[in-house]
């Protein structure tokens, strides 16, 4: 079932997000519809490939494509240059040329790395996103950000490179472990908190249905998240302005991930912590009422996500924040929520004061 298509309007780089339930076996037809030819390298991981590679392979072969698998180890800890080289090795071994393309079958790590491989292999070949986690469906598969982590920071190496299409099948969420599923809900909260108050209301009212993985509620939540992000990306593809709002919760969230070596928290969990802290900072500066801050905290708690920063010395937090890609000469660009459904961007130069508000003192 195809529920709807959402257009990401970027002139000649525009593409559609196809949303549905049980539509994974349409991938071959979709690739033909967007004009792709040649060999398809399916980049996946050891968790997702056993579940969905055969469906993708059969669909692609029915559509007349040669298909080769490139299967990687699973986990954020593998989002690095060594694993990226494994993708290049697979592409070279399969003799992929510029007329070939990549299918990114998996979560955000696979999408980011496969997209970066597509952007850089032979100076660029097409790719299609097939996100299989809630987090990647509502965030990383939309907007063209690709890349890998560096030991000193998250996503420090990468490029903007748009896919030819995105295919989202919410039925793939049936096999997602509970913790991974909840992590994706954390990223969904972001869209309501700073960009759509009505969507935030929907999430509050439908939290139980979402937790039960109700298909209709999920399609609504995922499609609305994608539509909100698509609109922001269309306005600001390369994060020169308004797109920075999508980093709400990510500043401290990325610091948490860096300090814990990307092993203690899933991305959506770290973002949930970051959003709660951002709401506290927003309340401190008078941008957000206590009632709205408490609504954000309550929804995140109701969705089974963490809210408190892990304990590390303030100096370590400052060091992690100083490597944030949103740092400029005039300070750290911090996204605050203005009530619920709106935002403001602030340049914060006193990281010590910011951490004090969050309960991290010297």
Curated annotation (Swiss-Prot):
NAD(+) binds at residues 74-79, 108-112, 132-133, 145, 154, 172-175. HAMAP family: DHQ_synthase. Zn(2+) binds at residues 187, 250, 267. This is 3-dehydroquinate synthase. The keyword Cytoplasm applies. GO terms for molecular function: 3-dehydroquinate synthase activity; metal ion binding; nucleotide binding. It comes from the Bacteria. The lineage of its organism: Bacteria, Pseudomonadati, Thermodesulfobacteriota, Desulfuromonadia, Geobacterales. Pathway: Metabolic intermediate biosynthesis; chorismate biosynthesis; chorismate from D-erythrose 4-phosphate and phosphoenolpyruvate: step 2/7. Belongs to the sugar phosphate cyclases superfamily. Dehydroquinate synthase family. One of its GO terms (biological process) is aromatic amino acid family biosynthetic process. It comes from Geobacter sp. (strain M21).
């Amino acid at each position: 079932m195809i529920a709807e298509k959402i257009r990401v309007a970027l002139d000649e780089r525009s593409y559609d997000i196809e949303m549905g339930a049980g539509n994974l076996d349409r991938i071959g037809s979709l690739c033909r519809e967007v004009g792709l030819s040649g060999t398809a390298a399916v980049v996946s991981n050891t968790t997702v490939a056993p579940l969905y590679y055969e469906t993708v392979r059969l669909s692609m072969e029915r559509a007349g494509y040669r298909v080769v698998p490139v299967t990687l180890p699973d986990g954020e800890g593998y989002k690095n240059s060594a694993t990226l080289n494994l993708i290049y090795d697979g592409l070279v071994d399969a003799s992929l040329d510029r007329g070939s393309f990549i299918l990114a079958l998996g979560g955000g790590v696979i999408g980011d790395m496969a997209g970066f491989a597509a952007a850089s292999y032979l100076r660029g070949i097409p790719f299609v996103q097939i996100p299989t986690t809630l987090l990647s469906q509502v965030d990383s598969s939309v907007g063209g950000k690709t890349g890998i982590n560096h030991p000193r920071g998250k996503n420090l190496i990468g490029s903007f490179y748009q896919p030819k299409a995105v295919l989202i099948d919410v039925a793939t969420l049936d096999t997602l472990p509970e913790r991974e599923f909840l992590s994706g809900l954390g990223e969904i909260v972001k869209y309501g908190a700073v960009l759509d108050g009505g969507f935030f209301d929907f999430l509050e009212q439908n939290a139980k249905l979402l937790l039960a993985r109700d298909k209709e509620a999920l399609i609504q939540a995922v499609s609305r998240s994608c539509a909100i992000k698509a609109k922001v990306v269309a306005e600001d593809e390369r994060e020169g302005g308004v797109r920075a709002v999508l980093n709400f919760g990510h500043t401290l969230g990325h610091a948490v991930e860096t300090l814990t070596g990307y092993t203690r928290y899933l991305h959506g969990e770290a973002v949930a912590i970051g959003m709660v802290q951002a709401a506290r900072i927003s309340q401190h500066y008078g941008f957000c009422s206590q009632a709205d801050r408490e609504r954000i905290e309550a929804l995140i708690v109701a969705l089974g996500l963490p809210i408190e920063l892990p304990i590390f010395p303030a100096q370590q937090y400052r060091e992690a924040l100083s490597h944030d890609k949103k740092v400029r000469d005039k300070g750290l660009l911090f996204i605050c929520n203005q009530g619920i459904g709106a935002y403001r961007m602030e340049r914060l130069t006193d990281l010590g004061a910011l951490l004090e508000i969050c309960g991290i003192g010297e």
